Regions:
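Conserved lysine of the Walker
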Residues: 108
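A conserved segment at the C-terminal end of the G1
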Residues: 111-121
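Flexible phosphate/Mg2+-sensing switch loops adjacent to catalytic phosphate-binding sites
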Residues: 90-91, 119-168, 435-439
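Canonical P-loop GTPase G-domain recognition
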Residues: 49-60, 318-428
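Conserved C-terminal guanine-recognition region of P-loop GTPase G domains, centered on the G4
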Residues: 198, 208-211, 233-350, 359-379
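Long, basic/Gly/Ser/Thr-rich N-terminal segments
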Residues: 1-92
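Hydrophobic anchor at the beta1->P-loop junction of P-loop NTPases
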Residues: 98-100
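Switch II of P-loop NTPase G domains
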Residues: 84-85, 93, 179, 188-245, ...
Length: 444
């Protein structure tokens, strides 16, 4: 049966313009499509036979839901360009695009799963800010990663890290295929999270203005090889739209960093025992990402990107002794402190920007000594670069006696600073959403 043909304008209360998180098209709210419900309309011309058709309605229920040609109430929305689904939260809240990338085996997927799980635990209780899935279907794989790490039924058993989370693929379930006539385009699926201040937040009265839908894109390291970003597979073009970029750098993969650690004599059990440990150059990934962003953002070669770049130094548990010597402390506490409390007596915390920036300065100093080309590549590309340490699981990994792989008991995972790059980026890019401590020496 042909798709339902309606003429007219759909009116939805919310933002005047909406940005699709899949194809990044910006369009007036009245152009948004609805997804049919009746089985007669199975098979969309752009998405294929397994998807319900999209349409622009003229009839609505008293509750504002569109009505398809068979009289069924519709509940889901879609982009008028790519026809992929758009969560309702993006109709009401502005998007905040963030991109995370890194070399293969850099620990990016572990970091991402650990970060989002910890954000779910702390955002409401610590910062009086909601943090929830804006689209549970799009976030399904990330939720599975979180469960494997932190809600594993085998939590007390020794599990290989390779069995807990699989590497990010270039194609598959994290991509959507859309047909534009004879041209098929593969779009990367974002992870979507809705955030808003809650009662008790210092800016709770500005919840509608400060609220955001975080659109987080995870890029496979292989996507940054030459020829991997083309019209039919625009896998990294969202990076030019991102308000912040996160480059995951694994110091234990860098031979210079390992040589910097007393010729390997201070390597911990993780680095000595992991037979799967790769030694690889990671700066080409950063340089290729920078080149693509310059091209898509139309930046001159001499012009710096004005959006902040965060270099996340992963597997901190393997090299923490180096930074602790520079910082002068081995404090593994989170960088926030109470600043007040709600009417119900719950504490509200503020992010300790001074402490974070102190760790960032010493992290940069360490990288400048061990891997100066990474520092140069980052600071040549972006005007605001921050180096931060993080460990996705903490000090709980052990090499296997037989195969040399790394093992851990999921119950023993104690992440270090995995939320800090995200929280610090929000504080810098979107002031007001994350409460912060008053700066030392600042005047009121």
């Amino acid at each position: 049966m042909p798709p339902p043909t309606f003429n007219g304008t759909a009116t939805i209360r919310g933002l005047p313009r909406i940005t699709c998180p899949h194809c990044w098209e910006s369009f007036p709210a009245e152009r948004i499509l609805w997804i049919t419900e009746h089985a007669d309309f199975f098979g969309d011309p752009m998405l294929g036979p397994d998807h319900q058709q999209r349409f622009l309605p003229t009839r609505f229920t008293v509750d504002g839901e569109a009505i398809d040609a068979r009289g069924f109430s519709c509940h889901s929305l879609a982009c008028p360009k790519c026809h992929l689904s758009v969560p309702r939260s993006l109709v009401e809240l502005e998007p905040l695009f963030l991109s995370i990338f890194g070399a293969p085996a850099s620990g990016k997927s572990f970091f991402l799963a650990s970060m989002t799980y910890q954000l779910r635990q702390i955002m409401s209780s610590v910062f009086a800010t909601s943090f929830s899935d804006a689209d549970p279907l799009l976030n399904q794989q990330l939720n599975e990663y979180e469960e494997s790490l932190f809600l594993n039924p085998r939590a007390q058993e020794m599990c290989s890290l390779a069995s807990l989370i699989r590497k990010t693929e270039e194609q598959g379930e994290l991509y959507d295929q859309v047909s534009y006539g004879s041209q098929t385009v593969s779009y990367p699926r974002p992870f979507l999270f809705a955030m808003q201040p809650q009662p008790g937040h210092p800016n709770s009265e500005k919840a509608d203005r400060l609220g955001r839908v975080v659109c987080l894109y995870d890029n496979a390291g292989e996507s940054f090889q030459p020829g991997k970003d083309v019209v039919s597979s625009p896998v990294t073009r969202h990076m030019a739209l991102s308000r912040a970029l996160f480059f995951v750098f694994d110091p234990t993969q860098d031979v210079r960093f390992r040589n910097f650690m007393d010729d390997g004599s201070t390597l911990n059990d993780q680095m000595r025992g992991d037979s799967q440990l790769r030694l690889s150059r990671q700066e080409p990934i950063l340089q290729e990402a920078a080149a693509r962003i310059r091209r898509y953002a139309k930046l001159r070669q001499s012009e710096k990107h004005r959006r902040p770049l965060f270099v996340i130094l992963t597997k901190y548990d393997a090299w923490s002794h180096l930074l602790e010597q520079l910082v002068g402390e081995d404090n593994r506490s989170e960088p926030w402190k109470p600043i007040g409390q709600t009417q119900s007596g719950e504490r509200i915390h503020g992010l300790d920007m001074d402490r974070i920036e102190r760790y960032a300065r010493f992290s940069r100093h360490l990288m400048q000594r061990a891997c100066p080309d990474i520092v140069a590549a980052a600071e040549t590309f972006a005007s605001h670069v921050t180096f931060l340490p993080a460990s996705a699981v903490g000090w709980c990994t052990h090499p296997g006696r037989k195969d040399g792989q790394l093992y851990m008991r999921p119950a023993e995972a104690r992440p270090f600073w995995v939320t800090v790059p995200f929280l610090y980026a929000l504080a810098r890019c979107h002031p007001g959403l994350i409460p912060v401590l008053k700066r030392q020496g600042a005047t009121s």
